[in-house]
C-alpha cells in the first residue's frame, strides 16, 4: 500500500512544528484535542488526521488547510 503524498506532508509539518517548539506528543495532542497516541500515528503515517482537525491544525501550524495538499 502506497501512502499518498499529502499524508507525508501533514506528518512532516506536525513533526517539524513539535520539534521547533519543543512540544511532546502529549502537549501537541492537547493543543488539538487528541491523544499523544493519535499524534504519534499521524507522524508515523500509520493514519492521518480526520478532516475536522485540519482547520485547527492549520491555525496551529500557521499555514492554510490547502497547504496540506500542495503536492497532489
What are the functions of these language-model segments?
Residues 1-20:
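A short, Lys/Arg-rich alpha-helix, primarily the initiator
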Residues 12, 22-23, 49-52:
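Residue-level signal for the short linker/turn that defines the boundary of a DNA-recognition helix
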Residues 22-41, 56:
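Short alpha-helical DNA-recognition segment
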Residues 32, 47-48:
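A secondary-structure capping/hinge motif
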Residues 44:
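Short, conserved catalytic or interaction motifs in soluble domains
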Residues 52-67:
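DNA major-groove recognition helix of helix-turn-helix/homeodomain DNA-binding modules
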